[in-house]
């Protein structure tokens, strides 16, 4: 907690105490404190004073903001603190937002904590005394590394909690209690908005050391199919043992995910990089064949693109992110193929030129190799690719033929102009000098005329 925010929380607590109430730190802050982790999320809950009294207190301490005054949630401008009053929720439908909320300042800590999702998130700490209030055994579950729901009725009303269970399990390397798994199997996730699904997935992909746990736990809860069907379809898809000692495509994907997590901080687009790990072998679902005892997945990187597109468009509207992942997934086999062939500079230049982020393509090919088991990363290939990326960047920094050069030479823009520019760009990738490239391009344009 930032010291400035802590001091303000203490001021609020002191004013509330003067009115006969108590102020508690709640939720993730208390959990992280007991885990020895730093938490930027500061949530306090005010008990024992009426909403109007709390509003007067906040007005006296700063500029009050209302994040949801009708259900007792406030803030103070300039401070990163969420200030809430105890409340109860009643489901009015099947959706994540289908709830009626009732503010009750005198609900008591037990009932207030009962609405939380997991025991490790249901603990409270008195801001002034430091006393920990733990009605549901959160500290013990924290020690054991177990995620356990607090209340089966309220847990089952909110399907997002299934994803949160998998997300927390991945982030903290916790197990999920058997009774929570059983309850989660009965819940319907189809009513969730894709933004909520993506939010939990993003946390698992970017914060977990082993993001594979997210999908493994979703599978254990029988909840992969609604949002992650293509991952279920990877289970049992065979791979040649010579190249994939780790087993089927599901096992490989899980290992690539955890390998990618080791490299994601180096990627220009960490979320896109991790999503690529999820989807990169979807093409094997439709391309894998077995002939004379040999398993093949010819051209799976490109054949999988429709499945990748379908998967991504289900969970996000971010076109730039979708474009990045589709590009990286479709090219992920090329770096090691070209390195193995010791391909010429034009071939590697063309590969990098077709990549949205060339460095991330190399990085992902490394993660893919790591996902095949120990010894699959070949240092000589890595060096080859990095040297060729340097060469590509050098090539692209050289003068090249532009549209203005062609117009100056007498060409007029028309239907074939883009084809002519593409020809000149191909010469640039071949490291042909600008003068020579211009001459060859004009000759090509004459042949097209």
Predicted regions and their residues:
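Catalytic cores of the polymerase beta-like nucleotidyltransferase superfamily
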Residues: 1-449
């Amino acid at each position: 907690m930032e010291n400035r925010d802590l001091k303000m929380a203490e001021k609020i607590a002191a004013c509330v105490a003067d009115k006969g109430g108590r102020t508690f730190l709640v939720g993730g802050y208390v959990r992280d404190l007991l885990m020895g982790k730093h938490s930027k999320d500061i949530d306090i809950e005010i008990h024992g004073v009426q909403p109007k009294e709390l509003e007067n207190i906040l007005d006296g301490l700063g500029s009050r903001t209302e994040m949801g005054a009708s259900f007792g949630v406030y803030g103070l401008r300039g401070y990163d603190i969420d200030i809430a009053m105890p409340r109860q929720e009643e489901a009015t439908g099947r959706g994540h937002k289908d709830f009626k909320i009732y503010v009750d300042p005198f609900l008591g800590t037990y009932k207030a904590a009962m609405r939380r999702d997991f025991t490790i998130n249901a603990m409270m700490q008195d801001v002034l005394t430091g006393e920990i209030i733990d009605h549901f055994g959160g500290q013990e579950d924290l020690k054991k590394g177990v995620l356990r729901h607090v209340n089966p009725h309220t847990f089952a009303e909110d399907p997002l909690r299934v994803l949160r269970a998998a997300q927390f399990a991945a982030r903290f390397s916790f197990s999920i209690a058997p009774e929570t798994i059983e309850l989660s199997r009965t819940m319907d996730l189809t009513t969730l908005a894709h933004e909520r699904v993506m939010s939990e997935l993003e946390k698992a992909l970017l914060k977990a050391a082993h993001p594979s746990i997210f999908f493994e736990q979703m599978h254990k809860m029988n909840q992969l199919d609604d949002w992650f069907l293509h991952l279920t379809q990877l289970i049992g898809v065979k791979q040649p043992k010579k190249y994939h000692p780790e087993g089927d495509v599901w096992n490989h994907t899980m290992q690539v995910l955890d390998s990618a997590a080791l490299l994601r901080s180096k990627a220009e687009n960490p979320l896109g990089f991790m999503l690529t790990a999820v989807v990169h072998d979807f093409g094997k679902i439709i391309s894998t064949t077995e002939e004379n005892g040999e398993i093949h997945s010819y051209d799976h990187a490109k054949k999988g693109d429709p499945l990748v597109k379908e998967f991504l468009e289900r969970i996000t509207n971010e076109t730039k992110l979708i474009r990045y992942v589709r590009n990286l997934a479709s090219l992920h086999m090329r770096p090691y193929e070209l390195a193995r062939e010791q391909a010429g500079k034009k071939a590697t230049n063309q590969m990098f030129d077709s990549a949205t982020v060339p460095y991330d393509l190399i990085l992902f090919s490394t993660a893919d190799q790591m996902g095949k088991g120990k010894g699959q990363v070949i240092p000589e290939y890595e060096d080859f690719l990095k040297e060729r990326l340097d060469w590509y960047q050098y090539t692209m920094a050289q003068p090249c033929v532009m549209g203005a050069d062609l117009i100056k030479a007498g060409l007029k823009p028309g239907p074939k102009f883009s084809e002519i520019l593409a020809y000149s760009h191909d010469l640039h990738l071949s490291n042909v000098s600008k003068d020579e490239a211009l001459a060859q391009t004009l000759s090509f344009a004459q042949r097209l005329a």
